[in-house]
Amino acid sequence: MTGVQTCALPIFKELASKVESGGKPVIEDQAFREKLAACEIELKALELTQLRVVADEGKHGKGKPNPASSVLKIKGSEIQQTTTELLMEVIGPFAAPYDVHGDDGSNEAMEWTAQIAPSYFNNRKVSIYGGSNEIQRNIIAKAVLGL
């Protein structure tokens, strides 16, 4: 789950250094950099948690799932959604590159942006499929907290 996001973040940084918003590259926006840094930190924490879960795999009863897998699912889906949100923020108005009646053509979109918005909306489902994040939290509450 972390591989795609790990590969995508450097690409997002490069795009953010090329795409301008308000006359300056998006990467120079302090709020954007803070969101990007938070996403990178969350991604690194998820990678380390995955390694711990794999290392501890033999400690759980045979056939019993590790409750930490629910944590991985929740955090992984949240990070996946965050990365697509960051990409949407980078491309800004280019997210809708289609000609609109009366458009003077001044908003020339980059060709690749046509797939970004559909991908963003498609990725909203990741917190639902495979068991919603709320269900995963209930699993954690029962297995770990005994609630």
Residue ranges and their predicted role:
Residues 1-7:
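Single conserved hydrophobic/aromatic residue that forms the stacking wall/gate
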Residues 8-147:
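Alpha-helical interface subdomain recognition
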